[in-house]
């Protein structure tokens, strides 16, 4: 098994240098060439690339002062040109206003908004009084918090729960209206003649029997009220049920031979013969 661990020599060891690979086979480049005699494979060691952190840091920080023509210095010059053009395009007040607005938008709780100037002062080194005098909070800008919350306006008030941001009443009303507009409309019930007739009966203080006996209702209104009050399913099922003429039961129904009445048991049959049979 090949050893992938390289022994460290304390005399020549540099902790700032990292190697590309510790496997000697992985550091060799193998190529195959095909000619008339056959395939010839050649291998040569790959150049070992060392990354020294100390050299990279020194090159990074000294390239600006020396002004050499390497890639790092050109990148620094390009960045410096962009920064100069950015500073020339905007004033310091506009930059502070933009930073403050970005930090306020990044704040999760509205109660932490007064602490934004202090944090911005610690980051930029500009005094807090100067930040508060030259910039405006997000609630006072035209496209600030009101635009963020969909046009809702906030007012800082003192309530029984303490200081905080409170929505104005008209804003709450706008939110309720917008919520109602998103809800599906309720389906309207059709105003049929049956409902109108029933409402007339319920709104009147007269007795039902006196109302029906009077000549105010015609035959159509009576049919409408009856069909609305009674259960239609019950009348559809009831004629299909055969009951005993004595006890009203509906199990083991049989009929009398003489008169044809329905009987369910022997006792009902005896009682029927004694009292109700017409053809005895």
Curated annotation (Swiss-Prot):
Zn(2+) 2 binds at residues 256, 259, 272, 277. It comes from the Eukaryota. Belongs to the SWR1 complex at least composed of ACT1, ARP4, RVB1, RVB2, ARP6, YAF9, VPS71, VPS72, SWC3, SWC4, SWC5, SWR1 and HTZ1. InterPro entries: Vps71/ZNHIT1, Znf_HIT. Its main location: nucleus. Transmembrane segments: none annotated. This is Vacuolar protein sorting-associated protein 71. The keyword Disulfide bond does not apply. It comes from Saccharomyces cerevisiae (strain ATCC 204508 / S288c). GO terms for molecular function: nucleosome binding; zinc ion binding. Residues 64-92 are annotated as: Disordered. Residues 64-73 have a biased composition (Polar residues). A zinc finger (HIT-type) spans 244-277. It is found in: Nucleus. Zn(2+) 1 binds at residues 244, 247, 264, 268. GO terms for cellular component: chromatin; nucleus; Swr1 complex. Keywords: Chromatin regulator, Metal-binding, Nucleus, Zinc, Zinc-finger. Residues 74-92 have a biased composition (Basic and acidic residues). CDD domains: zf-HIT_ZNHIT1_like. One of its GO terms (biological process) is protein targeting to vacuole. Signal peptide: none annotated. Participates in the catalytic exchange of histone H2A for the H2A variant HZT1, an euchromatin-specific factor, leading to chromatin remodeling and changes in transcription of targeted genes. Indirectly involved in vacuolar protein sorting.
């Amino acid at each position: 098994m090949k050893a992938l661990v390289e022994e460290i020599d304390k005399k020549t060891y540099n902790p700032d240098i990292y190697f590309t690979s510790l496997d000697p086979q992985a550091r060799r480049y193998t190529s195959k060439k095909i000619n008339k005699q056959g395939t010839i494979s050649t291998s040569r060691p790959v150049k070992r690339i060392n990354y020294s952190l100390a050299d990279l840091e020194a090159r990074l920080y000294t390239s600006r002062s020396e002004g050499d023509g390497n890639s790092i210095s050109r990148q620094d010059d390009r960045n410096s040109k962009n920064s100069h053009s950015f500073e020339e395009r905007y004033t310091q007040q506009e930059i502070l206003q933009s930073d403050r607005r970005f930090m306020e938008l990044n704040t999760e709780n509205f109660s932490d908004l007064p602490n934004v100037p202090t944090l911005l002062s610690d980051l930029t080194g500009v005094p807090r009084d100067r930040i508060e005098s030259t910039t405006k909070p997000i609630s006072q800008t035209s496209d600030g918090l009101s635009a963020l919350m969909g046009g809702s306006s906030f007012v800082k008030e003192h309530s029984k729960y303490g200081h905080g941001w409170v929505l104005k009443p008209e804003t709450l009303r706008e939110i309720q209206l917008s919520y109602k507009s998103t809800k599906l409309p309720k389906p309207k019930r059709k105003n049929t003649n049956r409902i109108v007739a029933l409402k007339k009966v319920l709104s009147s203080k007269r007795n039902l029997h006196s109302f029906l006996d009077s000549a105010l209702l015609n035959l159509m209104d009576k049919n409408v009220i009856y069909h609305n009050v009674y259960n239609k399913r019950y009348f559809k099922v009831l004629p299909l049920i055969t009951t005993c003429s004595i006890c009203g039961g509906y199990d083991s129904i049989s009929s009398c031979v003489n008169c044809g009445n329905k009987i369910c048991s022997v006792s009902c049959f005896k009682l029927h013969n004694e009292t109700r049979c017409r053809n005895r």
